[in-house]
Every structure is written in structure tokens, then in C-alpha cells.
Amino acid sequence: MTILQSYTTQMVLLGTALLGLASGIAGTFAVLRKESLIGDGLSHAALPGVVIAFLLTGIKDIEVLIIGAALSSITAAWLITITVENSKIKFDGALATILSAFFGLGMVLLTYLQSLNNAGQAGLSKFIFGQAATILARDVYITSVAALIIIVLTALFWKELKLISFDVEYAKTLQIPVTFTLILYRSLLIMTIIIGIQSVGAILISSLLIAPAVGARQWTNKLGTMCILAGCFGMVSAIGGTIWSTTVQKLPTGPAIIVILSVVVLLSLIFAPNRGILWQFRKRGAP
């Protein structure tokens, strides 16, 4: 337990805990809107933004890389939207195509950057699978502030986010600013993704965004309870995965967090009352 007494480890745990909490809350609305795959597309799209930001500036500070990731994810979201609206391609087709293109571009740029033997690029590959051990106290501060902003915005616009999650047309009849709320919803997803790629990685951050909500949905039909449960599942998994990756040498943080989160979701799918597999078997076997 000595490693847990380290100030650096405590800061990293704080950052990943808040990230897990924010991810569970933001992902709840994506699951309810049946847009679980949007997180996958936006997270993969963030990678080329990270690399391009470094290529243009030569700076590896998290503030710079986050801006690159955000611009790249926003561009991907915009391309997905205009593709669906102006062609016969459906949402999943546009998402898969743009996801693959952006992530492929990111990998090509990362390979090119590594071939330059630029010492400054060391550590950028950690953005693929994540590595909490490389996070500095300043990075944790930025992550924590962003996570708190996500939580506060969700609380402030709770009614609006709830309505667009279930019935957009009904929200319009109530004079809810639907366009603004949809932009806010996508912004929450993008913000969660860009603050999480350093810890969890571009490949797996979408799982941290969606899986907690999937697990929480098994236990309740109430949105508020679902949000709280999803946040708790994300937070506990993030803490557990961070401790695991910190204590085991060369274990990336992202996979460690997702393995623990997968266990939580699996247990929810099996044991949750009313929706769980065991409960369903019990009901079928009842006379």
C-alpha cells in the first residue's frame, strides 16, 4: 500500500476517479439516445488531432494536445452529421467510415512522427491505450476541472438533457431549445473523450463512456438513479484500473480500467433484479 501513499499516485487516482464519474454521467444520455457508437467515433477521431497539434507546435503539454483532440473530434462529428443529412448513407455507415479514416490518419501520422527520431514525441503513443503513470499533477488538475464542468452542466441542464434523451419532438413542443441542448450533449461527450484519452486511450475511452450506463440500466428504470449508478460504476472501475496499472509494470491504464468495468457490467447483466439473466431464468421457471 506504500504506492498509494505517494502524492503523485493520489493525484492520478483523483483525476481518473472524476473522469470515471463524468464518463458514466455523460454516457447515460448517449445510451438512452441509442447513440452508443458515437463515443467510439469521436474517440478514434481525437487521435490525429493530438498528433497534428504536436507536429504544428512541437509542444507536448496537455493543454495543446487537448485543443487538437477537440478540434479533430468536432470535425468528425460535423462530417458525420453532414454525411447523414446530405446522402443516403445511414448513421452507422457514416460513423464507421469516418471513424476508420480518422483513426487510420492518426496512426499514419504517429508512425511518421516516430520515424523522425524526435525525442519530444516520446509518450504520444500512450494516447492509444492510455497510461496514468505518465500524467503530471497539472494534467490531473485540468482533467478534474473539466470533469467537474461536465457534472455541473449536466445538473444545470438536467431537464433539457432528459427530454432530448427520450423524445426530441415532445421537447420542441415544450419550447425547449433543442438545437442548443443537442450541441451541449455532444459537447459533453467530446469533453469527456478528450480529457480521458491520456488516461484510458483513444481506443478504449468510448467503453468508459458507454459501459457504466449499460451496467446501470440493468438496475433501474429511473434516469436520476441510472446517472448516479453509472457515475459510481465508472469511478470505481477507474480507481481500480489505475491502481492495477500503477502496481503492475508496463500494464496500460486503459485496458486495466476496462477489464474491471467489464466485470462490473457482466455482474449487472447476470444478477440485476428484473433485468438480470438469473432473474429472467427464475421468472421463466416460476409456475
Q: Predicted segments — roles?
A:
Residues 25-29, 51-55, 78, 82, ...:
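Alpha-helical transmembrane segments of multipass membrane proteins
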Residues 28-43, 47-117, 217-228, 248-250:
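Short loop segments and helix-boundary regions at transmembrane helix junctions
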Residues 136-212:
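Helix-loop-helix "hairpin" substructures at the membrane interface of multi-pass membrane proteins
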